[in-house]
Amino acid sequence: VQYGETDYDFLCRMAAEEGIFFYEEHAQKSTDQSLVLCDTVLYLPESFEIPWNPNTRTEVSTLCISQFRYSAQIRPSSVVTKDYTFKRPGWAGRFDQEGQHQDYQRTQYEVYDYPGRFKGAHGQNFARWQMDGWRNNAEVARGTSRSPEIWPGRRIVLTGHPQANLNREWQVVASELHGEQPQAVPGRRGSGTTLDNHFAVIPADRTWRPQPLLKPLVDGPQSAVVTGPAGEEIFCDEHGRVRVKFNWDRYNPSNQDSSCWIRVAQAWAGTGFGNLAIPRVGQEVIVDFLNGDPDQPIIMGRTYHQENRTPGSLPGTKTQMTIRSKTYKGSGFNELKFDDATGKEQVYIHAQKNMNTEVLNNRTTDVINNHAEKIGNNQAITVTNNQILNIGVNQIQTVGVNQVETVGSNQIIKVGSNQVEKVGIIRALTVGVAYQTTVGGIMNTSVALLQSSQVGLHKSLMVGMGYSVNVGNNVTFSVGKTMKENTGQTAVYSAGEHLELCCGKARLVLTKDGSIFLNGTHIHLEGESDVNGDAPVINWNCGATQPVPDAPVPKDLPPGMPDMRQF
């Protein structure tokens, strides 16, 4: 990123970072000029020889070097660069580079560069080029010549110097030309045109590279607006990064190409856990820069403004802390709100659609006062093992239509005092095997109309003391085969008007006027000891017998009940 620097400074800094040097070339037969970018001395033009001659006054016609001074300086001996990338957080991100040609100095002068401005293996080249840049003037010679052909980008071979080790190939790294062409005053001789070339060279067995240049730093955080494609509300990549448009940006439109992808700082960030809130298109964010580097922006926060207002209405809701989202391309929201107003403290949760709660172990809810739940549609509760419900005082359960209760095994209901069950129309009870009712004191059964009892096999009734049956009108017993009655002491059968015992054609009738009628095909009287009969008049075989009277017809015999007179 070019930030706070001229175009030339930006290009020079980028070239130095990539180990590139550049020079100008002038065409020999035209005015054309070329800018040559190069990263190695090997591809410079072929070198040419130029002699050493300190006596320029006597040999002015020959291009030569009249001054040549060689010096060596202490420079950094090694470079260690290090950087970090969030895409490979476990990567060491370190590269070391030792300097070369260190015959004239010690080797413990290290340069440590962090951040190294690299995100991969290219950092090794950065370290090497930086090392070359720091040592680009460790060995340098400065000279003077009248030759205009000594300029950066050329190589020369010095010859004839009395110090033999200087007669070698050199790379020209700097050149400063000074020329004079004085005007001749009439009547005077004047002086001739002169050209002096003050140059600097380094040994040509190494590549000269520019020293690392300082990168402009951002003074502090900046404000920006999140951008994205037209019609999109949330625009991010797989890392949760977004794009923004800075307020100072005059050229880029507010779309998906406004900036590079920018990381977003979250309140908590762990491996698969933490907090995640993606800034949405149109929100104002605060962008800071790691180490002040314009190339490493990071969103540190968000802020409201006149058009993006806060939840609630300030300052009236100043006691509320709110986390409220917004439905994607909609008007709904989810919300978690804490209200700390004195005497009105509240925690409020709003789910726009579904709300799921998952507890892997225990959950305890403690409500000191009241608890109310309202469900608009259905509710399903599944308990894998046991459920205990304790109610201190009363429970009222109202079912609007139907209720189905299924118990897989046993059910025990204990009522400490009273139980009242009221069924408006019909109640049906089906027991698969056995049914037992135990009443400690008194049990009353009241049926307003009809009661029917059906037993598939046997029915047994056991009464500890007394047994009383009171029927308002009629009683009918129908036994398919045999009926036995056994009384331990006394059996009394009483009828107000008519008592009749029938078996086939035999009948025994007792009426309320004291008449006894015994009618049958054959009548046998046998006494083990005696047969006694007393009456004032005894008629025997004289036609004085009367017909047996019929029983009165029941007036309210229920439908389907048999008429006992037919037997």
Language-model segments: which ranges?
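Extended, domain-scale alpha-helical bundle/helix-rich regions
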Residues: V1-A204
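Hydrophobic alpha-helical scaffolding
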Residues: V1-G4, Q67-I74, N136-R146, P212-P216, ...
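Structural signature for extended repeat/solenoid scaffolds and their inter-repeat hinge/linker regions
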Residues: I20, E24, K29, L37-T40, ...
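Short helix/loop capping segments that flank catalytic or ligand/cofactor-binding pockets
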Residues: Y23, P45-F48, P76-D83, P89-F95, ...
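Intrinsic-disorder/coil detector with helix-boundary
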Residues: S34-L35, L44-F48, Q489-A491, E497-F567
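Extended boundary segments
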Residues: K87-K119, T207-R250, Q320
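Glycine- and acidic
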Residues: W134-A141, L158, D205-Q211, T227, ...
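Acidic, low-complexity/disordered segments
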Residues: Q163-A224, M300-Q306, T310-M321, V553-D556
